[in-house]
Design a protein with these regions (language model features):
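Structural motif detector for alpha-helix initiation sites
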Residues: 32, 94, 219, 287-290
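Short, charged/small-residue-rich alpha-helical element at the C-terminal edge
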Residues: 228-300
Length: 309
């Protein structure tokens, strides 16, 4: 893929602060239309990488291409950044705060009002737009922060823990907004510790540990790569005893069968299909969760000295 087709191209980044090496060797690419997961434990170097992408820090080694080349002042207006440390003007109304920050990003006043009204409606904030930001709940402030990050229609969106403080209803509202941005062609980098959100939303990820890229690819490919020889069977009736099944677990009508190397999934399906009074509703590979993979990959490298996030 060419540089122009990538929103971000990071190659062999390294960054130290005194004797502490925060980033050792990080490489990845983010495409337009991606929701890309930037993952890693606390202290892995994720925030330092984000700050290098945004040109807040300069790398000691390696290269970064942002929207087709080096970062410029003009490109900064094409980027939306939601940091983990939130920042809003708290002593003014929600509407005034959103419009002010939109105009700082070059959005004309009338256009900013139109976009703000659309977001207020979409995120159930219309009834609260005259309130001071400081009078809103944490979850509502989070939604306002999301609006200020999106209102200038960025080509690149970098969001750090976007679902922090949100209940399930508001989490779904924010998910819908982010998917809408993805469908518009926006490149989205999402840093989060919520692995179920990664499975639901991200198509590609990089896992950073101790400042290095240790896992990189599509979510589907990575889950298949770490899959055990196991299947998930949903069936009505009792499963028969089958030679070569070394471990089983059950939740309701769903059974996970871990097989020995000598048993293939095709052979297992044949045996189950021949079992009397067993109605199979689904039969599929049992893929590990991203949470399982995160713990496995990061756990393989512990213990060690901590890095700096």
């Amino acid at each position: 893929m060419t540089e122009q087709e990538n929103a971000i191209a990071v190659s062999h980044l390294a960054k130290s602060f005194g004797a502490t090496q925060a980033v050792r060797d990080a490489s990845f690419e983010v495409r337009f239309g991606d929701i890309f997961g930037l993952l890693g434990p606390n202290g892995a170097g994720k925030t330092t990488i984000i700050r290098m992408i945004l040109d807040i820090f300069k790398p000691d080694r390696g290269s970064i291409s942002v929207l087709g080349g080096a970062m410029t002042e003009q490109k900064k207006d094409l980027i939306g950044y939601l940091p983990e440390e939130r920042g809003l003007y708290k002593d003014i109304s929600v509407e005034r705060c959103v419009l002010y920050l939109a105009e700082l990003k070059g959005v004309p006043h009338n256009e900013a009002k139109t976009r703000a009204a659309q977001y207020f409606d979409q995120l159930d904030l219309t009834a609260h737009k005259r309130k001071k930001v400081q009078d809103l709940s944490k979850g509502m402030q989070q939604k306002v922060q999301i609006i200020t990050t999106l209102i200038h229609r960025p080509k690149l969106l970098i969001i750090d823990e976007p679902f922090s403080g949100l209940d399930p209803v508001n989490t779904r509202l924010i998910q819908d907004v982010l998917l809408q941005e993805r469908d518009r062609g926006t490149a989205i980098i999402m840093s989060t510790h919520q692995m179920y959100q990664v499975e639901e939303m991200c198509n590609r990820i990089v896992l950073i540990d101790k400042g290095e890229s240790v896992l990189y690819g599509t979510v589907d490919d990575i889950r298949r790569q770490y899959a055990d020889n196991a299947v998930r069977v949903v069936a009505q009736g009792e499963l028969p005893q089958i030679e070569g099944v070394r471990e089983t677990s059950r939740k309701g009508n769903a059974h996970v069968l871990h097989l020995t190397e000598q048993v293939s999934t095709q052979a297992l399906l044949r045996q189950l299909s021949e079992a009397p009074e067993l109605h199979i509703e689904s039969f599929a590979l049992a893929l590990p969760t991203m949470d399982d993979i995160f713990v496995r990959v990061v756990g393989e490298t512990r213990p060690t000295a901590k890095g700096t996030d």
